[in-house]
Amino acid sequence: MIRRYLRELRICEYYKNCAGGITKLLFKLHNHYRNKIGLQLGFEIPLNVFGKGLHIFHTGNIIVNENSSVGEYCTIVGTTCLGSKNGGNGPTIGNHCELGMNSVVIGNVRIGDNVYIGAGAVVTKSFEQNEISLVGVPAKVVAHKN
């Protein structure tokens, strides 16, 4: 079911970014189906937020702010929130990042490449270093990958 949702997400992004008469109709059709699957899975993921290679391991509430930006090959392990403070910009997350179960990234923060955000971590400030692990509330760097 997750694969179907991701497939529909990418199809909707394609039709949304294309200009033309029939693509609007196809977009509406696929977007309706994507939203239907998203309700069953608990996903609220706007279009054109994630780069290629998004991988989701588990169902559960995944809420993403439409002003967020996530790089390529991101992995989400379920029940994750990428949000904003008071309607502002959402987080910007680099390539090859992994978001653990129940992780939260809130506000206009920047996260580097190859970052692991641990289960239950709450990130409220920027960590632009690459290849680090973040855990805790509020999140702190606990390891540098080599």
Model-predicted regions and their roles:
Residues 8-11, 68-76, 113-117, 121:
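Conserved long hydrophobic alpha-helices within structured protein cores
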Residues 78, 85-87, 91-146:
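Glycine-rich hexapeptide-repeat left-handed beta-helix
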Residues 28-73, 80-87, 103:
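Left-handed beta-helix
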Residues 7, 55-56, 98, 116:
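N-terminal alpha-helical segment
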Residues 22-23, 59, 100:
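A generic structural signal for short
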Residues 1-41, 139, 145-146:
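Terminal amphipathic alpha-helical/low-complexity segments used for targeting or macromolecular assembly
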